Each structure stands twice: as structure tokens, then as C-alpha cells.
Design a protein with these regions (language model features):
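Membrane-interface alpha helices of multi-pass inner-membrane proteins
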Residues: 161-177, 188, 210-214
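Transmembrane-helix signature of polytopic, membrane-embedded enzymes
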Residues: 103-128, 142, 343-344
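Juxtamembrane membrane-water interface segments immediately following transmembrane helices
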Residues: 42-45, 49-53, 180-187, 203-272
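Short acidic/glycine- and proline-prone juxtamembrane loop motifs at membrane-interface regions
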Residues: 70, 132-140, 363-364
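Perimembrane helix-loop-helix junctions
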Residues: 3-8, 12, 150-153, 182-214, ...
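Short hydrophobic/aromatic helix or loop-helix immediately within or flanking a transmembrane segment
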Residues: 49-55, 63-86, 96-97
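Membrane-interface anchor segments at the N-terminal boundary of transmembrane helices
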Residues: 89-90, 95, 284-354, 358
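Transmembrane-helix motifs of polytopic, lipid-linked glycan transferases
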Residues: 93-114, 146, 325, 329-330
Length: 414
């Protein structure tokens, strides 16, 4: 009774339109501040790898750079601009243009222009910041987002641009090795395409030359190393430890209190640990890490799962949880997994996969494609008025608070 009275009062005073307009205004300001803050930062972190790749191309040529391993699609986009601008400026400018392309894509693909959807998208991009960094993640994410969204459109209303979807997937595939971690939901998506006969609409005459082009560009890498050219953060030449060993040791040290959370030991310290404790004292690769200490794997899985939900809430608000609730309700009702729940299923699967395989701290940016698709899913629910308006209002309240918090956090860093 009290809930109904509260709902009636909120409706009477037209709280929802007021909240929506307030959120859109604040998030616009938030996005301007975030854009300026992240673009004016000095280059650092993973950006240095791509700056070094550009320098390598300019000094040694494309053949040598591809043999060494670079992200070919990303470098092809950045290289022409790097001849006119500083390397890090060219890297970031390409990512800003890719972001604009993402907004244009959704504007073309969505049936109606929904201010709330673009507000949610701006909030997410402004909060995470990494779309403005000069790294290849933005191109990788863009390809996966377009591909998965097209598959979602196929299962939802049997309308999809299959050729665009496969081109986008090919771009992602040749951009980052991380694509292989997404294999479970990619296999799921191929099943959906098969079930809805989406393969029949593909323009094979266009797709085959594009695939041949990408394979041809990778020939130097195939001949030199026998694999696709992906950017690699290789350890120093005198180091024997692997990235998995360094990350695994990091979690061991964090658990015993000898290393701050979300930090790594030096490569030298990792090598010293292997010398002192034996070569088999740390797992050499990702698969070994899963079974090296089952108790630790299970413990860290739940820690990472909690961390993902906690920090994911900071990036998405209630948008993160509502599709998962919707999925649970659907499973309880139908006693099966329905294809109509594609996006919630993909979200849950990828959260669980990254929580399982990452023994040390997880970087939430790896989940960006499914997080943005979650925004798509939530905005569709909002448009179709499937959820009670109180949920929408509560989400606006949460995002308004988080937007003010984000603005304050960025402002204090100037």
C-alpha cells in the first residue's frame, strides 16, 4: 500500500522526466570534463608499447615490425596520423574517432533516438576513461560490440547486417589476442546465427577478400613466428619468468601482505622466486594456473566475482544487475536458457570467465563489450516499459550520484 502511494506521488510530480533531464545535463558536463582530463594526460602505461611500435615501423619498416608482433589493424589506422602528429596524439585521436563511430553506429542501428541510452553510454565512457587512452582496446571493443549487437538484433527481430557483423568480428580477431577469451560467447553467437539462418545473408564475395587481406598482412609473422601478429608486452630479454608467473606471484604476495593490492612484483623478483623455489613453483601459463592450486583458484574466483560486481556498479549503476535479475527470473520461469536472454547470458558468462582465469586482479576494461551491450539491453527494457518505472527512477538517482562523484574525483586531479 505504501509502495503504491509512493509510486502515485512520484508519478503525479513527474519525477521521471525531471530525473532524466537532470541526468542528461550532468552526464554531458561529466563527459566534457572526462574528455579533457584523459586527453591532456601525459602518455604512460600500455600507451608506451604502441608508441614504441610506431617508432619501430618508422625506423625498421612494416615487415620487421610485423615479424616482431604488432596490432596490425590498429597500426594501419594510426600510422598515417602519426606522420603529422605526435605518436601519442595520433593514438588518442584515432580512439576518439572510433568512439564517434560507435555513436554513429548506434544512431543508425537503433529504431528510435533514445536520449537515455546515449546518456548511459556517455556515463560509462566518462567513468572508465580507457577509451581515450592510446591503446588498441577501443578498436577491439568496437568490433566486438558491433558484432554482438548485430547478432542480438538477429535473434530479437530477425534483422541484422550480417556482412558488417563479420567484418567487425574480423577486425577484433586480428587486433587483440584477447578475442580467444571471448570464444564461449562467440560459439554461442554462431549457434544463434545458424538457428536464425543468418549465414545466408552474408556477402561472401566481400568477406573472403577482406579475410585474405588480413591473412596476407600477417604473412611476415606467420613466416617468422608461425602465428598471427598481436601486440605483446614481452618481459625484458634477460628474464625467464612469464606474465602468468609474475601475476600468480603477485596474488600470493598480496595474500600474505607483502605486496599492495593491484600491484605486481618486479620481473627480477619473480625470477629470484623461481630460482629460490624451483622452476615449477609457479604456473607457466594460464591453463596451468587454473589447476596449480585448486583451493586458491576457487577462493580468488569469488574474490574477483565480488570485485567485478562492486566496481562494475561504479561503472554502470543498477544497469549491471537488472539484466542478471531478468535472466534469473526467466530461467526460474521457463526452466531453461532462452536465446532471447543472449545479452544477460553473455554478461554472466564473461564475468565468470574473467573471474576464474585471472588469479591476480582483474581489469574491468576487458568486459567493456558486454558492459556496453548490457546498456543496450537495459535501455531496450526501459523503452519497452517492461520494468516498473520506480526501477528506472532509482537507477537515475544512482547514476546522478555517481556522476557528481566522478566529476568531483576528476576535478580534484587537475
Amino acid at each position: 500500500m505504501l509502495y503504491q502511494k509512493l509510486e502515485l506521488m512520484l508519478t503525479k510530480f513527474k519525477v521521471l522526466p525531471l530525473l532524466q533531464k537532470s541526468f542528461l545535463g550532468i552526464v554531458f558536463i561529466y563527459s566534457i570534463i572526462a574528455l579533457y582530463y584523459f586527453l591532456q594526460k601525459s602518455p604512460g602505461g600500455d600507451e608506451m608499447l604502441f608508441i614504441a611500435d610506431l617508432e619501430l615501423i618508422k625506423k625498421e619498416g612494416w615487415m620487421h615490425a610485423i615479424e616482431k608482433n604488432i596490432s596490425i589493424p590498429y597500426m594501419l589506422l594510426v600510422y598515417p596520423l602519426s606522420l603529422l602528429l605526435k605518436n601519442y596524439v595520433a593514438l588518442r585521436l584515432v580512439n576518439v574517432l572510433l568512439l564517434i563511430l560507435l555513436f554513429v553506429y548506434f544512431a543508425k542501428r537503433k529504431d528510435t533516438f533514445e536520449f537515455s541510452f546515449y546518456g548511459y553510454l556517455l556515463f560509462f565512457i566518462s567513468t572508465v576513461g580507457y577509451f581515450f587512452f592510446g591503446i588498441n582496446d577501443t578498436l577491439f571493443f568496437l568490433g566486438l560490440i558491433i558484432y554482438l549487437n548485430e547478432v542480438n538484433q538477429l535473434q530479437k527481430n530477425n534483422k541484422w547486417n550480417g556482412t558488417l557483423a563479420i567484418i567487425a568480428l574480423l577486425v577484433s580477431f586480428f587486433t587483440r589476442k584477447l578475442i580467444f577469451v571471448y570464444s564461449p560467447i562467440l560459439i554461442f553467437s554462431w549457434y544463434i546465427i545458424y538457428k536464425y539462418k543468418g549465414f545466408k545473408s552474408l556477402n561472401i564475395k566481400l568477406l573472403i577478400p577482406i579475410l585474405v587481406l588480413f591473412l596476407g598482412l600477417n604473412v611476415p609473422s606467420f613466416l617468422h613466428k608461425g602465428n598471427i601478429s598481436y601486440d605483446l608486452k614481452n618481459p625484458p630479454k634477460n628474464i625467464k619468468a612469464t606474465w602468468t608467473q609474475r601475476q600468480y606471484l603477485a596474488q600470493l604476495m598480496v595474500n600474505e601482505g607483502s605486496l599492495p593490492d593491484q600491484q605486481h612484483p618486479s620481473w627480477e623478483k619473480t625470477d629470484a622466486y623461481l630460482i629460490a623455489n624451483g622452476e615449477n613453483s609457479l604456473p607457466e601459463n594460464l591453463i596451468d594456473g587454473l589447476f596449480f592450486d585448486i583451493n586458491l583458484t576457487v577462493k580468488e574466483f569469488f574474490k574477483e566475482l565480488y570485485s567485478c560486481m562492486f566496481y562494475g556498479f561504479r561503472q554502470l549503476g543498477l544497469i549491471l544487475f537488472i539484466p542478471l535479475v531478468f535472466l534469473i527470473k526467466d530461467i526460474l520461469k521457463t526452466k531453461k536458457l532462452n536465446i532471447s536472454m543472449m545479452i544477460p547470458i553473455c554478461l554472466l558468462v564473461m564475468i565468470c570467465i574473467f573471474s576464474l582465469i585471472i588469479i591476480s586482479f582483474m581489469e574491468l576494461r576487458w568486459l567493456a563489450p558486454v558492459f556496453i551491450l548490457t546498456i543496450v539491453y537495459f535501455s531496450d527494457l526501459q523503452k519497452e516499459k517492461i520494468w516498473n518505472s520506480t526501477i528506472i527512477k532509482a537507477n537515475y538517482f544512482v547514476l546522478l550520484f555517481l556522476s557528481f562523484y566522478g566529476i568531483f574525483s576528476l576535478w580534484t586531479k587537475f
